[in-house]
Amino acid sequence: MKKIIIKLYCMKKLLLVSILIVLRFTVFGQGTEFLEGKKWSDVLKTAQEQGKYIFMDCYTSWCGPCKGLAQNVFPQPKVGAFLNSNFVCCKYDMEKGEGIMLYKKYKDNIPGFPTMLVINPADESIVHKVVGYTEPDALIAALQDGLDGKTLAVFQKRYEAGERSLELIKDYCKALDVAYDQGTKEKIVRDYIESMPLDS
């Protein structure tokens, strides 16, 4: 009888520990859920079915900042909650498998690694991008700007249409900073300064 009571006690403890482990991961989240190892066509299909943009982490195996994002940023619950609720998330090594094809397709938008692209699954166009290691809150803010229509593509289109308001110049330069495009930013600032009347 004593052995049965001890076994039941041990089983009860084991069950309690198991429940606590499951609850810990349920309550605290597991960070960003990436569709890893999926074909690009499957990622596009999933995003279209869910009515979401695609968040694509473009990385390489030798990139230190890429590893920093993978270890310190994407696993954070607040980053995972934001990304998982707003995007279909995928990641590709740009030097292997499907990543090679995707790098060729988007190389004009990948100035270095890591680059995080927001892609419209309907036409596979770039909606927004963030380049370089980015802290969790800054990444969420930059991506929220993209969801709010404050994207590099929108600012570029307005600029190319001839708009030169100070507000646009500031927003465009901020988006260029996030996209790590200092050359274009310098040109826009220089053109804006040169366009100012001398008597102002």
What does each of the following model-derived ranges do?
Residues I110-L152:
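Non-catalytic, surface beta->alpha helical segment in thiol-disulfide oxidoreductase systems
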Residues E33-K38, C58, Q76-G99:
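Thiol-based oxidoreductase modules, predominantly thioredoxin-like and allied folds used
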Residues Q48-E49, A81-N84, D108-G112:
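Extracellular/periplasmic catalytic domains that process cell-envelope and extracellular macromolecules
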Residues Q156-S200:
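Oxidative protein folding and maturation machinery
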Residues M1-T32:
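Bacterial Sec-dependent N-terminal signal peptides
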Residues C58-F74:
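Conserved redox-active cysteine motifs that mediate thiol-disulfide chemistry
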Residues F28-K45:
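N-terminal "domain-start" segment that seeds a small globular fold
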Residues E49-S61:
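Short active-site neighborhood of thiol/selenol oxidoreductases, capturing the structured segment around
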